[in-house]
Amino acid sequence: MFSAGHKIKGTVVLMPKNELEVNPDGSAVDNLNAFLGRSVSLQLISATKADAHGKGKVGKDTFLEGINTSLPTLGAGESAFNIHFEWDGSMGIPGAFYIKNYMQVEFFLKSLTLEAISNQGTIRFVCNSWVYNTKLYKSVRIFFANHTYVPSETPAPLVSYREEELKSLRGNGTGERKEYDRIYDYDVYNDLGNPDKSEKLARPVLGGSSTFPYPRRGRTGRGPTVTDPNTEKQGEVFYVPRDENLGHLKSKDALEIGTKSLSQIVQPAFESAFDLKSTPIEFHSFQDVHDLYEGGIKLPRDVISTIIPLPVIKELYRTDGQHILKFPQPHVVQVSQSAWMTDEEFAREMIAGVNPCVIRGLEEFPPKSNLDPAIYGDQSSKITADSLDLDGYTMDEALGSRRLFMLDYHDIFMPYVRQINQLNSAKTYATRTILFLREDGTLKPVAIELSLPHSAGDLSAAVSQVVLPAKEGVESTIWLLAKAYVIVNDSCYHQLMSHWLNTHAAMEPFVIATHRHLSVLHPIYKLLTPHYRNNMNINALARQSLINANGIIETTFLPSKYSVEMSSAVYKNWVFTDQALPADLIKRGVAIKDPSTPHGVRLLIEDYPYAADGLEIWAAIKTWVQEYVPLYYARDDDVKNDSELQHWWKEAVEKGHGDLKDKPWWPKLQTLEDLVEVCLIIIWIASALHAAVNFGQYPYGGLIMNRPTASRRLLPEKGTPEYEEMINNHEKAYLRTITSKLPTLISLSVIEILSTHASDEVYLGQRDNPHWTSDSKALQAFQKFGNKLKEIEEKLVRRNNDPSLQGNRLGPVQLPYTLLYPSSEEGLTFRGIPNSISI
């Protein structure tokens, strides 16, 4: 195969750590020269020839030789080096390699390519990993070729290497993690509070109890606070396994700098400006809000000079040199400044807005509560049938023809309304909204119920008032405010449950379990890991700056210190299998099973943009997974007997989602069908579900009047100055009720970042490396998947251009539903499905 003294030519591609800091004075070459000499060594490991211990033979230490400037495929910041390995026939075929970094600075290893291997052609190693000084590791760093093997089919000389690498990633569960560590482990959410700083910043531990169940997050090993041994102390940097912290990516860079800047610099700067009365503390008219995009907001010179030098903030804010900050105009007002106020748009956003996955079919009237009457008394709805305008239908007819729907936040908010209303500047209701499906296929709201806990105590039942649609007089202002209370409930549920809990937090246990138990050689590892990209990192950043005590979420959203605790209450009823789109639609009563339809379900709202478009994406993902899995598993027994796979799923359920481990709905992972279902749901959550609830945040919520995050006062009573204000100045009354100016500026700053695609985003149907596997059949199936997504995008464009679908697809604001278009350019595009929860 190889003659004695044969050499294998290789190319190593890497990124120096300081690539982005390099000056344009030629020092880049000097930095690259540092990799030459005896700075970085590699040793090939045989996949076919074993030593006396049964392990693949290891070749000689070989060092990088020279800079390769002619490689055409290099990306930005990447550098290529030549290397020649001594290798002969007695060593067999290389299947892995060791690498040692003798420098003091780490680098990002992209790949190794071996050329002209006899009978093998090119062998590729896709690495994508930070490599630190070798003394920092307990075992030598190893990388495997891009072949795919279930455990039982691993070449015998590689078996122990495969097992040892997984063991090193699991760690031993002790000690504080360091920056260079690669260890994946679990912990509860016990680091959101900071009781050492103030008892007001203490927060309950989420996870590990029936009171506050929660998914697990990555373990950092930081010690406890002095005040509370159950709370983990804060740190300057929150550890994530090193390869989860994608420091070489623009998306990660933008997110980290942006959110930290907002929480640590911009928020205090805004606060100082308001304290100094240098900018008005309230919006006085709707035009004041529109001025954020048209004229900008004037801030003191020192505030501007504090903010603008920050790299991401420079992009975030537009300044004309006159101490004016401007936000981009949200999509929802780009055609009309007032269409957001219509009942049609209020209803449409429940099926085509940023939170389109909560509305339910109403199957009985009046609506009932599931709250325990022994604790909360009578929580039944006070809405009466004869008060509703059902376009000539009786209540029985409307129910029988499945034309009634409900946005129901009553049971979720009622247990917290009393505590929330005791907070400073927070006043709200638990809401129910009844909607009627008209003959033209659009929804109209017919009643809103606003409920408060009784002043005599919870057992005395709810105090409710029903508000009906009105077009004129003070009643129209009351109706507008009632819709605002609904949207405040919806905004909070969206951010904390639909977005944070159901995508970000629910995904992290699967990320951890995958790296602990599935080798990089495993077919399911190769299938799923693109959908984990940056998830742990953004979640750690959220714990540090967004969902932490007195962080951006608590500062800008109604529930304040109860925000994340409320998501724990919702997690009690989280069901993994219900995250599947068809199951979700059926459970919510907005679809019924129908085998005669392309996707097996029939929508009760015929053009429900999120559901209709989502089912197309769901079906494409399902086909891809159904074609990929049988390439490696021929029978159910193959799934049962895959030791890595079984350990992965057992731990994901029993540790990662341990508070729900005894629920009967978990798939048992005993069949091919189980495996397809599990992978399909994970990919759906990470890609399309997250895209649907994330990238519309600024397009819809950038207009705070359309998506208020808080309410500050209840409906005024007759005879009060506030009631007179409703009569005489409905704009001022509305603005005094919803989110005030300072939290609006902070909120808009955050959601603009969160709604923006980075230039290096990787979208569904794409991979960041075309050589992610050597399996040609898998590559062909993946190409087919990508082509199908392009077809779907064309289909969705046609739907949005269909005159018969304009009511739900464009609505009064004339904003087409594009959130589930698979592709996107960079920027604030209101479209695009990234592979993962990367922002």
Swiss-Prot record:
Family designation: Belongs to the lipoxygenase family.
Cofactor stoichiometry and binding remark: Binds 1 Fe cation per subunit. Iron is tightly bound.
UniProt entry keywords in alphabetical sequence: Cytoplasm, Dioxygenase, Fatty acid biosynthesis, Fatty acid metabolism, Iron, Lipid biosynthesis, Lipid metabolism, Metal-binding, Oxidoreductase, Oxylipin biosynthesis
Effect of residue 522 to Q: 1% of wild-type activity
Its EC number(s): 1.13.11.12
Keyword Iron appears in the UniProt entry: yes
Inducing factors: The hydroperoxide product serves to activate the resting enzyme. The activation is accompanied by the oxidation of Fe(2+)entadiene structure.
Protein name: Seed linoleate 13S-lipoxygenase-1
Residue span, PLAT domain: 16-145
Assigned GO CC terms: cytoplasm
